[in-house]
């Protein structure tokens, strides 16, 4: 009886698990490029709308994860580097968008009003949109906040992973993976490091 219960429990967990694709491979086209994504400004845009001449930077993010917003004296988080990335992206004619896929927290910390409030407090200078049902995250295979997806002018994946190698302090960063990838992408050069491990909180999907 015990083994039967465990088997049924395991089956239930399997059935309840969200549909999550493998992480996109380098060179693959961005998914859902014409799907409307509601922003904190009340306007819906698509990835195609947000793309710049040289590509599009998509960062899956949220309002509460310590890897994003920091945690007292332990880590400053990556959020403080978002606006600098936005400035760089604009100078390189690369579009940028933050995507909130935390559907399981949509009635609380990651609601649209909470996103708007957080963006104002943090001083975001880039679009911040809702990924309803975590559909875009599922299609990309995004797993964490933050999780970076950089696409070229044809919306083909050029870099995927982390922003850099130090979430704790920006001044201690040794490898600026995303910065370098964006610059080389805009210059038409081959990106040396196309994949790194994304480190962060799990995206809160509905189960």
For every predicted segment, state its role.
Residues 7-16:
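Bacterial N-terminal signal peptides
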Residues 68-121, 132-138:
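Structural microenvironment flanking redox-active thiols in thiol-disulfide oxidoreductases
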Residues 150-207:
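Thiol-/selenol-based redox modules, centered on thioredoxin-like
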């Amino acid at each position: 009886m015990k083994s039967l219960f465990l088997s049924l429990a395991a089956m239930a967990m399997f059935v309840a698990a969200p549909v999550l694709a493998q992480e996109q491979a380098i060179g693959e086209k961005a998914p859902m490029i014409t799907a409307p994504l509601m922003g904190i400004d009340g306007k819906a845009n698509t990835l195609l709308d947000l793309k710049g001449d040289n590509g599009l930077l998509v960062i899956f993010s949220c309002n509460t994860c310590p890897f994003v917003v920091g945690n007292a004296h332990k880590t400053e988080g990556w959020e403080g580097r978002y606006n600098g990335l936005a400035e760089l992206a604009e100078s390189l004619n690369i579009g940028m968008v933050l995507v909130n896929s935390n559907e399981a927290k949509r009635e609380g910390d990651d609601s649209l009003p909470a996103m708007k409030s957080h963006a104002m407090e943090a001083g975001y200078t880039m679009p911040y949109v809702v990924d309803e049902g975590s559909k875009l995250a599922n299609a990309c295979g995004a797993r964490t906040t933050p999780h970076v997806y950089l696409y070229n002018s044809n919306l083909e994946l050029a870099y995927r992973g982390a922003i850099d190698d130090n979430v704790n302090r920006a001044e201690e960063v040794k490898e600026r993976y995303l910065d370098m990838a964006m610059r080389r992408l805009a210059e038409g050069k081959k990106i040396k490091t196309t994949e790194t491990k994304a480190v962060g909180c799990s995206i809160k999907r509905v189960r």
